[in-house]
Every structure is written in C-alpha cells, then in structure tokens.
A protein has these predicted regions:
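Short, low-complexity, intrinsically disordered N-terminal segments
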Residues: 14-27, 60-61
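Flexible, active-site-adjacent loop/turn segments at secondary-structure boundaries
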Residues: 2, 48, 66
C-alpha cells in the first residue's frame, strides 16, 4: 500500500483548504500521461482513504492503490514552499 508521510498529509490538507473543497471531498490520484495528478472528488465505495486531523485528505481507488503499492508520498521543502513528491519505497530483505 502507498505510504504517506505526516508532512505530506498536512500538505494535502492545506491544498484542500486552498481549493475550497467542501466537506466530504478529498484529493484523488489519477493517472495522466507521464505520471500522476490529484483531483478533488467524493469518496467511492472500495477507496483507500488517508486522513489528517479527522478529515479524509487522500483517496485511492483499487487500481491506483495497486499501482502505488511500493511508493511513498512525501513533502519536500523548496524555498518557502513544500511540494508533494512520489518515490519508490526501498524493499528490505529482497
């Protein structure tokens, strides 16, 4: 399953506020040419949900969850801002 760091969850929460997302809405990873994008959507049955301070901030459907099984979402500081980044998680013992 995708691993998400606490700073990344906080960044997702701030992004939802900035976008004016209504209660019950969260960011969902979607495939796009050359990578991934985040869209504000409602939670669907079967989604994997990640929360921050009691609010769902990130959603993955089953297909995306499988594709991101060996990845970590983290926040990287760039100047005064933080950016969300994905990286492959190192497997131990392989």
């Amino acid at each position: 399953m995708l691993s998400v760091t606490k700073p990344a969850l906080k960044r997702l929460s701030r992004r939802l506020v900035r976008k004016g997302a209504a209660d019950g809405m969260a960011l969902r990873f979607k495939r796009r040419e050359g990578g991934w994008t985040l869209r504000v959507e409602h939670e669907s049955p079967g989604d994997t949900a990640f929360s921050h301070d009691g609010r769902t901030v990130l959603l993955l459907d089953a297909e995306v969850s499988k594709a991101m099984a060996d990845m970590t979402l983290y926040a990287r500081k760039v100047g005064q801002r933080s950016q969300l980044k994905l990286r492959r998680t190192e497997r131990r013992g392989d």
